[in-house]
Amino acid sequence: MSFGFKFGIPPEADLVLDVRCLPNPFYVPELKHKTGLDQDVVDFVMSHPEAQELLKRYENFLQYALPLYVKEGKSQLTIAVGCTGGKHRSITFARKIAEYCTQLGYEPGVQHRDVKR
């Protein structure tokens, strides 16, 4: 799930990942009114080395932690990825994390709570 911190952390979140530390496409005029569903926004976010490194670190954490949740009997886990407004960075990362979870053999669903705000 992607979300914007300015609208509150989703109460159903089991894990909250923060991507506000990354460069914000909101401040790029041609990207401001687009979202992480648009490829040029994804390209902008992921063009920064710190975004690639942060994604790798989140993936490493999930590779370790997800089997532990399964072992404890958790059949569903809500991973909430937040940025300021919930339209650019969080959507990009929520999609990337869902792709990674699929590679690990899980069946993630993805929601973008604040994309239309």
Question: Where do the protein language model's features map onto the residues?
Answer:
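Recognition helices and adjacent regulatory flanks at domain boundaries
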Residues: 67, 73, 87, 109-111
